[in-house]
Amino acid sequence: MAGQDAVKTAARTLDLLEAFAKARGPLSLTEIAQRINTPISSCHSLVRTLQARGYVYVLDNRKRVYPTKRLLAVANAIARHDPLLEKLAPILEELRRDTGETVLLGKRQDDHVTYLEVIEGTHIVRYTSSPGDTKPLHSSTIGKATLGLMAPAERAALVARIALPRVTPNTVTDRDALLDEIDRSAARGWYETRGENIADVMAISVSFRILDEGLGVALAGPISRMTENFDAYLARLKQAQAAFEALNASFEGR
């Protein structure tokens, strides 16, 4: 029971912080309770703890609550020393600069993909997401790329046990069809989705390993623009893949 309570408290803390991000302004205890679907008494205890640790402060006017910059300082300290991003960031930035499209870096976490980095494109109309967002393996291009890194038997076993919900009318929901697609994509060296996760978005990706970690990197944008620039984008993506592989070789050679 104690373990379950600790997990619930951790989840509520994250919900509270995300509520402030969505509200973009101070919130009262009543507003917090409504937004995170939690009793006011529990919210009060949570806010008092965060206040004591310096993560939120209370405004005298209407007793509203807002996070301090301590959270930002902690997050920045963590981000500065990310074992993967600090090494990959320059290559990702160059990829976005050369294509103008949104660049995604992701890693498989059991039955889904988590975005480790998102560098939004420079176009007015672009694909948007955030680091920490999760996507299904079967309907995201990085999901497919990371599936492609697995041994065939291991991949088949994973696909057999995970759900394959239809996210859009274009989502591949047949297990055999998905496995066949992954096999073909792995053989040619790149992966794609066309409106499978978001109806009007296309993404192409490649996979690579660095420091023994399997990752996927993708370019994503509107289907029309991605199709028009497909050859150039894929060539640039393969260049980034080669740069990642060279970086990994330099680490292994030490």
Regions found by a protein language model. Give the residues of each.
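Amphipathic alpha-helical regulatory segments at dimerization interfaces
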Residues: 35, 46, 87-98, 104, ...
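A structural signal for short hydrophobic beta-strand segments in well-ordered beta-sheet cores
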Residues: 56-58, 105-106, 208
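Intrinsically disordered, low-complexity polar/acidic regions
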Residues: 167-168, 199
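N-terminal helix-turn-helix
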Residues: 1-81, 85, 242, 246, ...
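Amphipathic alpha-helical effector-binding/dimerization core
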Residues: 62-161
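Short, structured helix-loop boundary elements
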Residues: 6-10, 29, 64, 68, ...
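Extended hydrophobic
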Residues: 174-243
